[in-house]
């Protein structure tokens, strides 16, 4: 009987240790993806961005980060926005120095010089908005 009790206690301790180890490990960051432009806007608003929906931009959001002065346009990435970006690049309307940054589910347009880009990307990454496929939209 005592032998069984000892085994049960040891099993319980082992199980508790495994649970504790599992709860301390963090899953790999996969980024935040959005099902729609509205979901993206809600996420931005709840994460310190001041955002206003602008239907003239095809439902994009003009956003500023709290305390910042730079305006960025966040737009849900769809087939339409991807084809528009490609057309802007080909026509020379889009800045070819990396100001237009695209992810799989969102697009960032800075409207500012290259010196602003690192700070914007740092803020976006710190907020977990990266989706693992951030690329320059123009080569």
Language-model features: locations:
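Bacterial signal peptide processing site
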Residues: 22-25
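Extracytosolic low-complexity repeat regions of secreted or lipid-anchored proteins
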Residues: 75-139
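Active-site-proximal loop/hinge segments that shape catalytic or ion-binding/gating pockets
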Residues: 14
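Substrate-binding/charge-relay-adjacent region of secreted/lumenal peptidase catalytic domains
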Residues: 29
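C-terminal motif of bacterial Sec signal peptides marking the signal peptidase cleavage site
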Residues: 17-20
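Bacterial N-terminal signal peptides that target proteins for export
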Residues: 1-10
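Short, solvent-exposed recognition patches
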Residues: 32-96
């Amino acid at each position: 009987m005592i032998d069984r009790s000892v085994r049960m206690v040891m099993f319980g301790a082992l199980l508790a240790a495994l649970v504790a180890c599992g709860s301390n490990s963090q899953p790999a960051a996969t980024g935040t993806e959005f099902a729609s432009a509205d979901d993206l806007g809600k996420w931005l608003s709840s994460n310190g961005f001041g955002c206003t929906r602008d239907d003239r931009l095809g439902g994009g959001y003009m956003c500023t980060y709290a305390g910042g002065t730079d305006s960025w346009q966040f737009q849900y990435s769809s087939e339409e926005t991807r084809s528009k970006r490609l057309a802007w690049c080909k026509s020379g309307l889009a800045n070819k120095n990396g100001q237009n940054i695209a992810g799989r589910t969102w697009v960032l347009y800075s409207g500012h010089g290259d010196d602003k880009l690192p700070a914007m990307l740092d803020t976006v990454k710190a907020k977990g908005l990266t989706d693992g496929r951030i690329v320059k939209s123009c080569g």
